[in-house]
Regions:
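Conserved ABC transporter NBD signature motif
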Residues: 54-62, 162
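Conserved ABC ATPase "signature" region
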Residues: 109-126
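Conserved structural motif at the start of ABC-family nucleotide-binding domains
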Residues: 2, 15-17
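ABC ATPase NBD coupling module
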Residues: 62-76, 104-107
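Conserved ABC ATPase signature
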Residues: 130-134, 138
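Catalytic Walker B motif of ABC-type/P-loop ATPase nucleotide-binding domains
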Residues: 156-158, 163-167
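Helix-to-loop junction immediately C-terminal to a conserved catalytic motif
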Residues: 46
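The feature captures the beta-strand-to-loop junction immediately N-terminal to the Walker
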Residues: 31-33
Length: 179
């Protein structure tokens, strides 16, 4: 939850006195025009940037007191724009969602999870394709799969799980937007 979040850019209030509470199993969608501060709010809630005023808490702990490593276990973020500089395959990109957690061990469970997420996102057929050869919509689905695998790793714990998506349907065709 958050308490009285405020953010300013160049002395202009972008966000002012925002209180949000999200309970387990709830879905929250934030709508507004371009430039309204939706991405900034997501970045504050995820701990990527710090608000000028107010606080964000995960399970009663201030996000500013939570290590980056621990944040990786309690939330997964898919930002509005994500680029891949190197020549990775789709599978490599999704697998990085697991490695972001600092666990470099490989097992059949990881392989099954990756295949399951690729199938769920309907991109299994792209598994060995190079990311930079994909369409914008296909790239978006790969990043979504990567976000899901980040959450899957610890899904058997009682820790709160937060999937934060910024413009999740950007570049997707209508059928995938609906799914």
């Amino acid at each position: 939850y958050s308490e009285k979040i405020s953010l300013r850019y160049n002395k202009i209030n972008i966000l002012e006195n925002i209180d949000i509470e999200i309970k387990k199993g709830e879905i929250l969608s934030i709508l507004g025009p371009n430039g309204a501060g939706k991405s900034s709010l997501l970045n504050i809630l995820s701990g990527s940037i710090v608000s000028h005023e107010g606080n964000v808490f995960y399970d009663e702990e201030n996000i500013n007191n939570i290590s980056i490593q621990k944040r990786a276990f309690i939330r997964s973020v898919m930002s509005q724009s994500q680029s891949v500089v190197f020549d990775f395959s789709v599978r490599d990109i999704v697998e990085m969602g697991w490695l972001d957690k600092g666990d470099y061990r490989y097992s059949n469970n990881i392989n099954k999870a990756i295949i399951g997420v690729l199938e769920e996102c309907e991109i299994k057929y792209l598994e060995n394709r190079k990311f930079n050869t994909l369409s914008g919509g296909e790239q978006r689905r790969v990043h979504f799969a990567r976000s899901l695998i980040q959450l899957w790793r610890e899904s058997n714990t009682d820790d709160p799980r937060y999937l934060m998506l910024d413009e999740p349907t950007a570049n997707l065709d209508l059928s995938h937007q609906i799914k």
